[in-house]
Regions:
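A nucleotide-sugar donor-handling region in carbohydrate enzymes
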Residues: 114-202
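A donor-sugar binding/catalytic signature common to diverse glycosyltransferases
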Residues: 24-28, 254-303
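Hydrophobic/aromatic beta-strand patches that form the interior of the parallel beta-sheet core
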Residues: 39, 70, 86, 109-111, ...
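Active-site and donor-binding regions of nucleotide-sugar-utilizing enzymes
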Residues: 11-136, 221
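Donor-nucleotide binding loops and adjacent catalytic segments primarily
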Residues: 182-261
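Short, glycine-rich nucleotide/cofactor-binding loops
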Residues: 9-20, 193-197, 269
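Extreme N-terminal starter segment of soluble prokaryotic enzymes
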Residues: 2-8
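C-terminal amphipathic helix plus adjacent low-complexity
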Residues: 313-386
Length: 386
């Protein structure tokens, strides 16, 4: 194992599970795979409790998977800075902590971990210095990304091996763990993890009137009320099954991260949102549709289109148009002449080619290294170069 480093990761929760999920995944990988000593400072612990049942939102301080989790509520006057300080998603750092960083005998490296984007400007800004005002500290932007010259994506060392071992028996066991029997033969299985702004009702209508069974796994969360309203149902309890026509919606519990990976592997097509589930869908090497986090003035549209441009490169025109059209529909972007039903039919017809493409895409992304390892390399270079 390489030399252990010390890390402080600061996270303000904005996108509920997205920000917390990325920071927890990073902290956990640094600690478990690299043996680093990691503190995760987070202002709202409750999302972590949903992601890992060993974590308690009631505790101010706890240690899980060798990560020290601290509720970030006070000024942190007594906190001794780590060697590397990660400011997640521009959430800032406590002023007394910054002062302690500046006063340290060996000043820490301050990294601003930015949101994931495929936009063309990202490589030029990755690793760029951004000296903070009023204090003599080194601060750099660190961008996850999909190309050389970026920080890559979070990926655990054994992820692909776990994915490739996941077979029909494991899939059946997963469904039973989630409170349901395995879907029958001939069904298209779909997972949906979306914001409430997604046009889910239109897709439910399409699936219910389809020529073959569609089984939808819908976790507890922001999209579930849309489905309950469609069915006129009031009970959102996990284990419930809602049926209409060819459609079967299975309510599943909000699940730990490792179990969610298995759900992605068990489904034919995955609808994902934000950042963490978006990345996991790509590692799953299955067809997927991404709902970008909605931003003011449509800033998320540029992010979506930049990613789609990169992801769809090399696809034949049919599958390329299918994934573009479904992505626009799902993000409520104008797609003239395209309906949710027509977009879905085209996407479903392209499953085979999209699955092959997804496997090749995942391998290409893996060649960039992983985000945790690339962060450590960045720190080593800075230490070596003084």
């Amino acid at each position: 194992m390489s030399t252990p480093y010390t890390w402080d990761i600061f996270c303000r929760v904005v996108d509920n599970f997205g920000d917390a999920a990325v920071c927890w995944r990073l902290a956990r990988q640094l600690a478990l795979e690299h043996g680093d000593r990691v503190r995760l400072w987070i202002d709202d612990v409750s999302p972590l409790e949903r992601l890992n049942p060993e974590i308690s939102a009631a505790r101010e301080a706890q240690e899980v998977d060798t990560v020290a989790i601290r509720r970030w509520t006070g000024p942190l006057d007594a906190a001794m800075p780590a060697q590397v300080v990660v400011e997640a998603f521009g959430g800032g750092l406590p002023e007394p902590y910054v002062a302690a960083m500046a006063a340290a005998a060996q000043r820490p490296l301050w990294l601003v971990l930015e949101y994931l984007s495929a936009e063309a400007w990202v490589p030029a800004h990755h690793g760029r210095p951004s000296p903070p005002p009023r204090v003599a500290l080194e601060r750099y932007y660190f961008f996850p990304g999909f190309v050389e010259g970026t920080g890559g994506l979070l990926r655990e060392r054994e992820l692909f091996a776990r994915r490739d071992r996941f077979d029909d028996a494991a899939s059946a066991a997963l469904w039973r763990t989630l409170g349901h029997e395995p879907p029958g033969p001939g069904s298209t299985t779909v997972s949906v993890f979306s914001y409430e702004s997604a046009p889910l009702r239109e897709l439910l209508e399409c699936w219910s009137g389809g020529p073959a069974p569609t089984v939808v796994a819908l976790p507890e969360g922001r999209a579930l009320p849309l489905a309950l309203d469609y069915f006129g149902a009031g009970d959102p309890a996990p284990g419930r099954v809602l049926r209409r026509g060819a459609l079967e919606v299975r309510v599943v519990p909000f699940m730990p991260q490792a179990l969610y990976d298995e759900l992605l592997w068990a489904c034919d097509i995955n609808f994902v949102r934000g950042e963490d589930s978006f990345v996991r869908a790509q590692w799953a090497a299955r067809p997927f549709v991404w709902q970008a986090y909605p931003q003011p003035e449509g800033a998320h549209v540029a992010k979506l289109e930049a990613f789609m441009q990169a992801y769809s490169t090399g696809l034949p025109s049919g599958p390329r148009d299918a994934v573009w059209d479904m992505s626009r529909i799902w993000n409520q972007i104008a797609a003239p002449g395209v309906t949710p039903a027509s977009a879905w039919r085209a996407l479903q017809a392209s499953q085979g080619l999209l699955r092959q493409h997804g496997a090749a895409w995942a391998e290409r992304l893996a060649s960039l290294g992983d985000l945790a390892g690339n962060l450590r390399c960045f720190w080593r270079r800075k230490v070596k170069n003084g």
